[in-house]
From Swiss-Prot:
Protein name: Maturase K
Gene Ontology MF annotations: RNA binding
Family: Belongs to the intron maturase 2 family. MatK subfamily.
Matches recorded under HAMAP family: MatK (MF_01390)
Length: 505
């Protein structure tokens, strides 16, 4: 008990540090716009990213002089605080990005303090950063489970809920007021985080701040798993003390369902403890228990969202499905658990008999419809799958056109390399080759048949050369086939995102 109390005091020690003065420090903005720490921001329009030390000094000087740090984005008749409109937008973005770095500091310190030397090395492992690391986990664990909850995590109903949840971790009132000021003054931001687009952050200008807020929201949503795990295993984990701030949720829950103590709620989930995975706004929770247990989980999820986040969740956000009769639509794959029956003949002395073995097998495949739709938007082919030339690329050289189509094919091959059935992937790549041929034939004002006849087999090899070289380094020579194609299953552990696999930049 003394160790638990000491850990709680350690966690609370950084909460009383004042973060607000850091917004007046120059090095904070250096961290915010460093290429290594802010890659997502640098993917946007480079013209608007002209920052310098002189600009930062001017911004800090104006922050000392002005009573307000930011202005309303929708008020056209307001007084100009930072001068020219372009500078106002620049300063506004600099403040928000700097503030995002500031609020990340306490959580980074908490993570570092909670890890020992071995775990720090594991965190730095590039393999664990790959989203493909989820699928080997599914293959190992989901084979022996019965039911799965297909969960769509609800979006925050109101921005004030995010500020209130952050208040339990961050005790600096000035920083919280500044965050609230950012969220409410810039009214056009409110739709960013309370809408469906908040998951991708593809077009959000201040995506780092909103990404932090959404990740913190999801972290709070997942925090009760630790409580249930500790209650189930009867272990006194030190992280349990940091979660005692959520006690007000159970107080609300008591009045809702007339439960006298938390132990009555937690005893529903003692055994068996389920397996949980999440990517972006979708989560899977699978268990070996019965259908009744999964309905209790669903009931707990809905009550948790309503009481803690004041979110009235719709029933269609949680589906209860049986793994043997259901395909999981997760991270661009259709995964399922199927029974493979096999008959084995065994002979002992003069007696022979047949044994029927029915093992479970985890299958995953790339769905053809979403892939076709994602490539139909940038006009690689029609919605019906008919290839059309990429007319905007006709001004490029032949090698650049082939290289762009080849990179798209290789990206798709890398991501869907773990598919059990690659027939759909081969169809997609075949249509991409025809689309590339149409683009080149349109550029040279020729027919597709004549162009393919002139290029020969070299044109097809451009789409598989890099993939074949990579596989030859990690697989024995026996696995190599003609044309560089490998029909086995390989999970690439260097993929950390999926949003740019198709829309090649």
């Amino acid at each position: 008990m003394e160790e638990l109390q000491g850990h709680r005091e350690l966690d609370r020690s950084w909460q009383h540090n004042f973060l607000y003065p850091l917004i007046f420090q120059e090095y904070i903005y250096t961290f915010a716009y460093d290429h290594g720490l802010n890659k997502l921001i640098l993917l946007e329009n480079v013209v608007d990213q002209k920052y310098s030390l002189l600009t930062v000094k001017r911004l800090i000087t104006r922050l000392y002089q002005q009573n307000h740090l930011i202005f309303s984005a929708n008020d056209s008749n307001q007084n100009e605080i930072f001068g020219h409109k372009h500078k106002k937008n620049l300063y506004s973005q600099m403040i928000t990005e700097g503030f995002a770095v500031i609020v990340e500091i306490p959580f980074s310190l908490l993570l570092i303090s909670s890890l020992d030397g071995k775990e720090k090395k594991i965190v730095k492992s590039p393999n664990l950063q790959s989203i493909h690391s989820i699928f080997p986990f599914l293959e190992d664990k989901f084979l022996y489970l019965n039911y799965v909850l297909d969960i769509l995590i609800p979006y925050p109903a109101h921005l004030e809920i995010l500020v209130q949840t952050l208040r339990y971790w961050l005790k600096d009132a000035s920083s919280l007021h500044l965050l609230r000021f950012f969220l409410y003054e810039c009214r056009n931001w409110t739709s960013r985080i309370t809408s469906k687009e908040s998951i991708s952050f593809x077009k959000t200008r201040n995506r780092r701040l909103f990404l932090f807020l959404y990740n913190f929201y999801v972290c709070e949503y997942e925090s009760f798993f630790v409580i249930l795990r500790n209650q189930s295993s009867y272990l006194r984990s030190t992280s349990f003390g940091a979660l005692l701030e959520r006690i007000h949720f159970y107080r609300k829950f008591k009045y809702l369902v007339k439960v006298k103590a938390c132990a009555v709620i937690l005893c529903f989930f003692k055994e068996p403890f389920p397996h949980y995975v999440r990517y972006q706004g979708k989560a899977l929770l699978a268990s070996k228990g019965t259908s009744l247990l999964m309905h209790k989980w669903k009931y707990y999820f809905i009550s948790f969202w309503q009481c803690y986040f004041s979110v009235w969740s719709q029933p269609r956000r949680i589906y209860i499905n049986q793994l043997s009769n259901y395909s999981l639509d997760f991270m661009g794959f259709l995964s399922s658990v199927r029974f493979n029956s096999s008959v084995i003949r065994s002979q002992m002395l003069e007696n022979s008999f047949l044994l029927e073995n029915i093992p479970n097998k985890f299958r995953s495949m790339g769905p053809i419809s979403p892939l076709s739709g994602s490539l139909a938007k940038p006009k690689f082919w029609t919605e019906l799958g008919h290839p059309i030339g990429k007319s905007v690329w006709t001004g490029l050289s032949d090698s650049d056109i082939i290289d762009r189509f080849g990179r798209i094919c290789r990206n798709l091959s890398h991501y869907y390399s773990g598919s059990s059935r690659k027939k759909n992937l081969y169809r997609i790549k075949y249509i991409l080759r025809l689309s590339c041929a149409r683009t080149l034939s349109r550029k040279h004002k020729s027919t597709v048949r004549a162009f393919l006849k002139r290029l020969g087999s070299e044109f097809l090899e451009e789409f598989f050369t890099e993939e074949g070289k990579f596989l030859s380094l990690i697989l024995p020579r026996d696995f190599s086939t003609s044309g560089g194609l490998y029909k086995g299953r390989v999970w690439y552990l260097d993929i950390i995102c999926i949003h740019n696999l198709v829309n090649d930049q």
